Amino acid sequence: MKILRLFVLLAPALVAPGVALAHGGSYSGPGTSAPGGAQVPPGTADPPASATRWETWWAANKEAFLRLNEQMREDVDPTSQAGGGAKPKPDKSAAELRRLRDEATRSALVPVFVEALSDESFEVRTAAAIALGKAGGTDGAKALREMSFKDKHKDVRDAAVLALGLLGRETDIPFLDARLRDDKDNPRHRAFAAFALGLIGGEDAAAALLAFAEGSPDKPSTFEREPAALVASTFVAMGLTGDARVLPTLRQALINPRFDDNIRAFVVLSLGRVKDRASLAEFGSLLAVERPTTKDVGLRRSAAIALGKMATAADAATVDVLCAAARNDPDENVRQFAAVSLGGIADATIKKRLEAMLGESPTAGRPFLALALAIAHDSDAAPAIRAALAKETDESTKSSYCIALGLLGDKEAAPLIEKQVEDRGRIWLQGYAALALGLLHHVESCDMLNARLMSDNDPRLRGNLAVALGLMHDPRSKNWLVATLKRADATVYERGGAAMGLGVLRLNEAVPEIVDVYRDKKEHEMVRAFAVVSLGLIADPSPVPKLSRFAIDNNYTLAIDPLNEVLTIL
């Protein structure tokens, strides 16, 4: 999608990190870097990084932990989903009032999105289709179906199909099933139909995907002869449905010699997403450091991720396999994914094992172990991470410690984290430190963060500063973003970034200003489209953006063109 491709090139000059790849591309196996750069959901700014850096994992998975939609809509002291301590109970009357305001805003925006579907700019139409899907605007379902095959631009057609999945209506399953089966259409469009079915989920969507893969008595399957990217996309979609009926087909695919290891690696991820405990032993064998049943790193990386979704702390053999992989696997990504999986299933014993690994690990391995301890809610590890931050010199590693301490809710770390902002090192360390202060709800830092927001000239840092202030419900972030949006001398990139920032902060009260920008036909096409994207973020009621399901717990070292494209959509 052109606007999203532009966003990649211009990301250093924009507030939010939404990113994209060009259309096209080929099916490829695992590599040493995330394909095409950062392919992540929107939220806070992250640097482009190799697939072995913690920033790449965080960019793909952060929505699950930040839960910005939930955090920004709280009228009380917010805490991160992964943060330590009990979350204060919101006042019921205030929460109900907020719910009503959100519903009213959403209802008012749906007609705006429907109107934007007919905009002369295909960028705006593309953004409007996705925004309509996020908002659950069923009034636009008919228009989306028509756009999916009539719009003159392929980006809009693809977005319309995916938007039908975001709407989540079972009544659209037959239409999407027909689009998936249309072998005259291009494979990416058909893959988007599969993804849409996965997003709708449930028995009927799973049945459509299974019928496509397995055939029927009157129409034998040609699935194995379909393009590899479409086959892999179908298996990804099966995992998204969450329906146990897909398990036999996925298990069979794992042993089907017609499917290569790259396809099978996606199958492993889907079995993990559906929590197929029957595959625990097999995946443990894939991951075993000594005498694994495969040498394919893509399969082993996927197994490390999947075991974290399928296992519990009581599965002693699986825990031992994950611990061995986190310590000693020759592949860096396997070690990292295994550590994160241990954090997700940790009990007191696993926490102690992770603490020991953190103490013994070389510097390169510590970011993921610190994050694993944060995911495990291991407050006992906070002093060790604090001490590591105090003496660390590598700014990337320091950044990971800041995020880990923020997720742990370790308020004792606030002065040390604040120092990372005040020392004015690289912008990424400052940005992550600011975000950590927001996660801690350290309101004592608000004046300092606001002063930096006003004085700094790097939009990437300003984006993280604005989100940090937003997490603490400080109104100055909104005021700065609105002022930037209205500034006549602001660049296209600054105005587009400000529009996106208002969406990231889910500011209902900024909707009139953002709508005005979209409707201003004299405004730059890029800014107008970002305004619609921003409105879509505000209208989305999901605690975690629906499209982030493709990125969370994904093996981002694998690449297929349709999935790469979905991962770029804002």
Describe the role of every protein-language-model region:
Residues 20-138, 142-150, 154-158, 167-192, ...:
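Extended repeat-based scaffolds of very large eukaryotic assembly and lipid-transport proteins
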